Structure formats: C-alpha cells, structure tokens
Curated annotation (Swiss-Prot):
InterPro entries xrefs: BRCT_dom (IPR001357), BRCT_dom_sf (IPR036420), DisA/LigA_HHH (IPR041663), DNA_ligase (IPR001679), DNA_ligase_AS (IPR018239), DNAligase_adenylation (IPR013839), DNAligase_N (IPR013840), NA-bd_OB-fold (IPR012340)
Sequence positions that bind Zn(2+): C416, C419, C434, C439
Superkingdom to which the source organism belongs: Bacteria
Keyword Magnesium found: yes
Listed GO biological process terms: DNA repair; DNA replication
Function: DNA ligase that catalyzes the formation of phosphodiester linkages between 5'-phosphoryl and 3'-hydroxyl groups in double-stranded DNA using NAD as a coenzyme and as the energy source for the reaction. It is essential for DNA replication and repair of damaged DNA.
Name used for this protein in its record: DNA ligase
Entry binding sites for NAD(+): D35, L36, V37, Y38, D39, S88, L89, E117, R140, E176, K301, K325
Source species of the chain: Mesomycoplasma hyopneumoniae (strain 232)
Cofactor(s), names only, from the UniProt record: Mg(2+); Mn(2+)
Length: 692
C-alpha cells in the first residue's frame, strides 16, 4: 500500500501536468495531448483527491485544476469579469453516469424534460448587446474573468457574429466559435501552424494586433492574417438570465436566438425522457463522421430553467447540464515499432506498428504519427503502452502514452529510408523532406498519385504494377505511361517468365496480355478527362482538388497553365502565398518542365466543365439544410453549369437552395431579397442555363 507521502506526490505531479496542459490548451492554442487522455488524467486526479483530501489544506484543494475552469489569462487583451461565471461541464462516460446525473433533476421536477445537442469542439464566447449593438465579446478565460476580443469578433462575418440585432434590451448570449473541417483543410494549405480546427479557431480569434501597420511590404502578412477571420463560424446555445427575457426553457432559448439571427445548431432535440435522450445520442454518434465540424461528445441539459437554481452548481460546473463523452473510440495497446515513409512531395510520415487491437469495430495493427515533433511531445516509448484513437480517420492516431516518461526513446530519422539522402526540415521545423528528385520512392508515389481515382483514374495501374514497371525499366515517369503502347514487345519480354517467353502468336491466349491490353485502353481513355484532373495529378505541393478546379477556370490546357501569371490569383479563391509559391516553384523546376513537355505531346482532349473566368458566372448559389444528395454533388453541378457557389450569403448571392432542417440562412435570405428555391426549381434553373 502506498504511503501518504507517495500519494501526495502523485497528486501534485498530476496537478502540475494538468496545469501545463491547460496553459497550452487555453492560452497558447497548442494542445499537448488529446482530449480523451486529458479527461482520463483529470478523472484520476479527482478520484485521488476525493480519497485523500486530508493530505491537503482547504486552500490547496481549491487551487487544484480539478476545481478551476480554464487557465490563468496571460494574453494582452483587456481582462473583464463575467456577469455570471462561465463554467465548464461535468462529464459522463456511460449511461449509468448520465442516469445518476438526471436523478437529481427528476427528484425536483417529476415531469422534467431534457435538451440534447452535439458538443462542438470550439472556443466558448459570450456576446453582449446594448440597444441592439454588439459592445463586448468575452472568451471563457478562467471562468471568472475573460478576454475582451471584441475587436476581432467585429471582423467575423455577420452571419456568424451579428453586429446588430432587432432587440433593444440588454442581452448576453453564449456559444462556440469554430472552423469547419473543409475550411480547415483549405486553411492548412496556407499554413501548417495549426494542429486542428479548434487550435486554428482559437489562434485566429485571440490574435492580438495593437496597431495597424503602414502599407508596405510588411503589411501584406497583416492583411492576409486579417482575412483569416472569414474562416470563423459559430453556434450559439444559451442566454444569460433568460427569465429576464421571458424565456423559460432551453428549447425556447434556442428558438429565441434563431429568430434574432444567431446561428443555432439544427441538429438538436427536446427529449421527453432518458430513453429518448439515449436514442438521440446514438443518432448523433452514428452521424458525427458525416458532420462538417468536430464534436467531442453530446451536451445534455435540463430543459426547464425553473429548477436551475435548486440544482445549483460547483465552482467548476453547473448541475443543470452534463457532457456525455464518446469514450469507445479510444483503446490501449502496445507500441511495437516506428518507421518512416516518403510521400510524392518527399514529405516524411512516421508510422507506428502496434499490437493488434479492436477499435470502433475494426482490428487495428498500425497507426499514424504526423511528424517527429509529435512523437517528442507525447514522449512515446517503444515497447510501452499507448492510447490510440479513431475518429473518422481510416488510419487511427496514437494520442498519448499510458504511463509517464521523461522523453521518447525513438531517435529522429535523419536520412531518407529509400535513397539515403539527408532529410531537410521545413521552415516550420515540424516536417522533414527528402529533396532528391531522383529518389525512387518519390518517383513511385508521384506516378501512383497521377493514376489515382481523383486524377487520371487508371485503375489497372495500381502501386504494385507501377513498382514492377519501374523495376523492369518500362517507365521512369508518369508521362511514360502514355507511350507504353509503343513498347509492347518489350513489355511481353520483360514481364514474362524467361522459360515461357510470350510471343505475338500466343499472346491472345495469355491472361497477362489481356490485362496489358485493358491497361492500354484505360490509358487511352485517360486522354479524355477534365483538365482539373490532370492539374491535380501533377502532384503540385499544396494544390488539392479544390485548387486544381479553380486553376482550370483560368487555363484550358497545359500550355495556358504554364504561361499563367499565378500572382494574379493572390488572395482570390483562398489562394494565399503558400499555394502561389508552390505553383511558381513547380513550374520553374527543370525536371518538372521536362515532364510537362512530354505531357504536351500526349494529345489530351480536355473536357470543358469550368468557367475560364468566375466573374462571368450566370448566377451565385448558397445552400442551407439537408438535400437528397451530398452537398459536394450540388457544388459540382453548380460549378459545372458556369455558376458560382459560396458557403455564406453575400450581397452577390442570387439563389438559396433550401433543404430539410435549414438554419438561419433562410431568414437572412428573406431579409436580403434572395430568391429561395427547392431542389426541383434548382434543377430547372440548371437545365435552362444550358439552353442559353
């Protein structure tokens, strides 16, 4: 049995660890561990403190991170007291824990109902309005004091932070600021400094600028950072002192907010009992991978405000609400090995071999580690236990060590595992690259990417066959694929068993030759593709499908693309300096020029599906609600018709395509005089546009 001194030391160690994590999470926007690891550690601390409270003075117990919200404010923003504490939420990890929480509410009110909604993984923000004008915007801070980030809140799109509302009484509303996953993916092309959408939202919202720079070369970065506020979105979920506004329930509160023009999560429900609650939690859990924003659980609230005072609160969280966490996406296993692989851009990815374990219904034996800094921060040790998590990713990620270690016992890889060239660090210092253009692995991965589904879609050229063709000297680049038809004799010879040399006479009987002929037919078909697919297939660093589609509006073939002034695209369509620099570097590279020269001789017949100039679009569309097909399909139809699509409503929006469970866009569209259409009307418009 542990001595009291050992238990006290353990509690102090856990407190220091959590304080450090809190500081990095709340103040530096740089989380050191995954939420699930944090929650497990906090629960361990809470349990030890409950069982051994006598080892500490009352003052020491009150100063524990288990009793406080957030972290000490260290930023330069004005520190302002909250009108009422901005508390955190207690957590439940099982149905039994949720039932235990609900029991107290049922004892006070037998007919109690509940309100359930996803728990957005964002940044808590409290907005204050006087005479309908936004006058203050406070972050959570330490729960008692927050940072007044009004100067930044005013830069966020009106759709997500209303600057004026049609309500003259003093009003305080609270919600979450977040960046959706698709927007974050675009943002990551411009900067690698954000680890996840929450980290990005916090970094942008709490960005401190105490002056406006002169208009010179240095101002460019400032202006680009200012434009980042367009990425921020919101969901608001509660009022402070709702009874003052004659609002008696959480359900009424969200309707009140929606009617005032605030974004309210449409995926929510008033539940009559716990059975209804559990059913809705199951629905949220099933659908969360299809949401375009991250959630880290579900919030369950007592719906009736009348019993909130009787339910009370602790210094850290209210008893009127609880967060139900999804814990079954985390598993414990053993880290067996770490090895590095090289991608088509030369970027190094660290991979983990783990002891097989079942996670989210699948048997897992490998996991991904983004870079060496990640391994260092988590202090991962080979042949020790680790936590792995699967939340929408195909390959799960290691999120922490089960036990504490002073440092990792795995050394950084310094040379390319394929060509042995010395690896070079990126400007950020996070990523490593092999810069040998003749590295066999880079060449292989470039060709694999070139043939992939979203590029030229040559199914018969999977990675193993490409490896074989490279090994036999049949190809050395992606362009060589189009000239395989001129090497039939060589293919027959080099891919055949020496003892059973294939000839033209018996070739027709060979399954292998049939396979080759199928491949050649696919290669010929690949000459008739949308131009954006070839752009994507080139594998230009930081140029994904979205950027490739945009580029195809400005160039209809390789020759036009090579002569395009990419600087003209700066700050348009989310094209920032990182993408522009990548494009310029790619087209100035001698080896790439040789590849492009070859591709220009292939004889592509590109389809014309995108406008060469978006300013000539015949209409502008926005979408709200759930439609009969995936949203991406409608965006594709809109763009291919020659129209433009925007996530948010703007002055230039002509049509709002409305689906089920539409949000506040419908009210904004009505006020702005934007025509609201259903799916039938939408397809009629598209059909008629093709006739003109």
């Amino acid at each position: 049995m542990k001595k009291n001194s050992q238990i006290r030391a353990k509690i102090i160690e856990l407190r220091e660890k959590i304080e450090k994590w809190n500081h990095h999470y709340y103040q530096l926007q740089n989380p050191l561990v995954d939420d699930l690891v944090y929650d497990k550690t906090l629960r361990e601390l809470e349990k030890l403190e409950r069982e051994n409270f006598f080892l500490f003075s009352l003052e020491e117990l009150n100063q524990s991170p288990s009793q406080k919200v957030g972290s000490k404010i260290t930023s330069k923003f004005e520190k302002v007291a909250h009108s009422s504490p901005m508390l955190s939420l207690n957590k439940a990890y099982s149905n039994e824990e949720l039932e235990k929480w609900a029991k107290k509410a049922r004892e006070i009110l037998k007919t109690v109902t509940f309100f359930v909604e996803p728990k957005i993984d964002g940044i808590a923000l409290s907005l204050f309005y006087q005479n309908g004008n936004l006058i203050k915007a406070l972050t959570r801070g330490d729960g008692v004091f927050g940072e007044n980030v009004l100067v930044n809140a005013l830069k966020i799109n009106d759709e997500f932070i209303p600057k004026k509302i049609n309500y003259l009484e003093d009003l305080e509303v609270r919600g979450e600021i977040y960046i959706d996953n698709s927007t974050f993916a675009s943002l990551q092309l411009e900067t690698k400094k954000f680890k996840n959408p929450r980290n990005a939202a916090s970094g942008i919202l709490r960005r401190y600028k105490n002056h406006k720079p002169k208009i010179d070369a240095k101002s460019i970065k400032f202006l680009e950072e200012e434009s980042d506020f367009r990425y921020l979105k919101s969901f608001f979920y509660t009022l402070v002192n709702p009874e003052k506004h004659k609002i008696n329930s959480q359900f009424d509160s969200t309707n009140f907010l929606r009617n005032l023009g605030f974004q309210v999560n449409p995926f929510q429900k008033k539940c009559s009992d716990l059975k209804d609650v559990f059913n809705f939690i199951s629905i949220i859990k099933q659908k969360r991978d299809f949401l375009n924003y991250n959630i880290d659980g579900v919030v369950v609230k007592v719906n009736e405000f009348s019993i909130y005072e009787k339910l009370g609160s602790t210094s850290k969280f209210p008893h009127s609400a609880i967060a139900f966490k999804f814990e079954d996406d985390i598993a414990k296993t053993k880290l067996l090995a770490i090895f590095a692989t090289i991608g088509r851009t030369g970027k190094v990815t660290y991979n983990a071999k783990i002891e097989p374990v079942t996670l989210a219904g699948s048997k897992i034996s490998s996991a991904i580690l983004p870079n060496y800094s990640y391994i260092e921060n988590l202090k991962l040790n080979l042949n020790t236990e680790v936590y792995i998590k699967k939340a929408g990713e195909i390959i799960p990620q290691i999120i922490g060590s089960v036990h504490n270690y002073p440092k990792t016992n795995f050394s950084i890889v310094k040379n390319c595992p394929k060509c042995n060239s010395e690896l070079v660090n990126s400007e950020s210092g996070l990523d490593q690259f092999c810069q040998n253009q003749f590295c066999p692995e880079i060449i292989l991965q470039k060709i694999v990417h070139f043939c992939s589904k979203n590029a030229l879609n040559i199914e018969s050229l999977a990675q193993k066959r490409i490896e074989k063709f490279l090994e036999k000297g049949l190809i050395s680049s992606a362009c060589d694929i189009f000239y395989l038809k001129d090497k039939l004799e060589l293919i027959y010879e080099r891919l055949s068993n020496k003892n059973q040399l294939l000839t033209k006479q018996n070739a027709s009987q060979s399954m292998q030759i049939k396979s080759i002929m199928k491949l050649l037919n696919e290669v010929e078909r690949a000459k008739n593709i949308d131009f954006y697919r070839l752009i994507f297939g080139l594998g230009i660093r930081n140029v994904g499908l979205k950027a490739a589609k945009i580029l195809s509006r400005y160039a209809s073939n390789l020759s036009e693309l090579r002569n395009l002034d990419f600087n003209l695209l700066k700050n348009q369509h989310d094209f920032g300096p990182v993408i522009i620099e990548s494009l310029i570097d790619y087209f100035n590279n001698q080896k790439n020029s040789e590849q492009l020269n070859c591709l220009e001789t292939v004889g592509f017949n590109f389809k014309t599906t995108f406008l060469t100039n978006q300013s000539n679009s015949w209409a502008s569309f926005a979408i709200s609600g759930k439609l009969s097909k995936p949203r991406d399909e409608y965006v594709r139809i809109i763009e291919e018709s020659g129209a433009s699509f925007h996530e948010s409503l703007t002055k230039k929006t002509d049509f709002l395509l409305l689906g089920q469970s539409a949000g506040s866009k419908i009210e904004k569209a009505k006020k702005a005089g934007i025509k609201i259409i259903n799916e039938v009307q939408f397809f009629d418009l598209i059909k008629n546009s093709k006739k003109t």
